[in-house]
Amino acid sequence: MPRSPRRWTPEEDRVLLDKVKQLFSDGAKNDTTISWATVANALPDRNNKDCRKRWSKITGAKKGSWSLSEDEQLLEGVQKYGRQWAMVAKGVETRSADQCAKRWQHCLDPSLDRSEWRSDQDARLVAAVRRYGTNWKDIKKFEFPKRSTTNLKNRHITLFRQRNKAPGACPGSTETLGPGIDWWSMEQGMIDDMSMDASEDGDDAEDDQTPDSYTSISTSSFDDILGGSSSSPSAADTMTTASPDPYQYLLDWAVPSHADLVQAATSYYPSLDGFLGSTYDHNAKIDSSLGRDANGGNFIPGFPTQTPSQFESIDVSQISDGIVSGEPSRQGASRECRAASNVSSGPQMTLTIDNPDPQTMTGILEVLAKANSKVTISMNRE
């Protein structure tokens, strides 16, 4: 069982720095000559790899994208030393042993599977996350031995974002949008792995191996890896993983028309029939302003999802008992929904909401419904 991730404390950092300083004063020339096992003896809950990685992090090892020359030096080091990462890092000079290990294991190893993801593999990945959580090391070991842990992590994030963008998927819903994919479990498994210390993530590099213990590495693909953009590691294999934005789905959808809001809110709050009135001055059929999936489905975030057949065929007369006239018009930039017969001639208030989102509109409509208010709702979608 993998150890539970645990953040480094200020006291542990102090002990680490003091111990490394002592070893430098005793003759160690750089971090590749330090006995990390000796350092770990001063920190009962940390091993030599934890200490080495933490040291690299807090002492400002070079970060960011790898240059072509660094990759070339890394490849040369692997050919010469195998997976003795301390020796490889000494040749690279600008990166730590653990950075070299991760760069190799996640990007440059010619045995990695960099092929496009298929739908059945996506389903397997989601099932694996449900079983193992976000322990990418175990998922790689048992499910995708040829994929890098970074590739697995990034694909999971991509699927999560696609799920939030997809028409027909309400955030937090349990419905399945693809064959065999349980999107709810994806959301439950989506955590910010990068918040943990680098020494504690699920895809740590293994400890340095001696020349007798590492498997011979094929270098026939090295030139392919470095020889041009067409064969460079894909974006899914890069070392930077962006945390998922839980509000991404709000940024990529058009704001729904007021008719969509009224129809959805009425189905959600039956009491709205009482104040929306019996005659509507707008299109006879719902004109959805949202995107459609391949099957013609529509979706309004935060509201119950209608089936495509229901959503595209419901007359407004089905919402309230009145006569609706007029043909659909798809040219206007704004829509109006008026409870014409119920609008009072007394004092009125105009409330303007910039960039309204469905959740806000739901709350407003609920308050108005409970107050039995007479309202005029309009939306300018310029």
UniProtKB/Swiss-Prot annotation:
Acidic residues composition bias: residue spans: 194-210
Pfam families: Myb_DNA-bind_6, Myb_DNA-binding
Record note on disruption phenotype: Impairs the ability to produce 1233A and 1233B.
Localisation per UniProt entry: Nucleus
Keyword presence, Transferase: no
Alphabetized PROSITE patterns for the sequence: HTH_MYB, MYB_LIKE
InterPro entries xrefs: Homeodomain-like_sf, Myb_dom, MYB_TF, SANT/Myb
Bias type Polar residues, positions: 211-240
SMART domains for this protein: SANT
Sequence ranges assigned to domain Myb-like in this UniProt record: 1-57, 58-108, 109-160
Gene Ontology CC entries for this record: nucleus
UniProt KW ATP-binding keyword: no
Region (Disordered): 194-240
Expression triggers: Expression is increased upon exposure to hygromycin B.
GO molecular function terms noted in the UniProt entry: DNA-binding transcription factor activity, RNA polymerase II-specific; RNA polymerase II cis-regulatory region sequence-specific DNA binding
SUPFAM superfamilies in alphabetical order: Homeodomain-like (SSF46689)
Highest taxon in the source lineage: Eukaryota
Function: Transcription factor; part of the gene cluster that mediates the biosynthesis of 1233A, a natural compound known as an inhibitor of HMG-CoA synthase in the mevalonate pathway and with antibacterial and antifungal activities. Involved in hygromycin B-induced transcriptional control of the cluster.
Protein name, UniProt field: Myb-like transcription factor
Organism, as annotated: Fusarium sp
Gene it is expressed from: g432
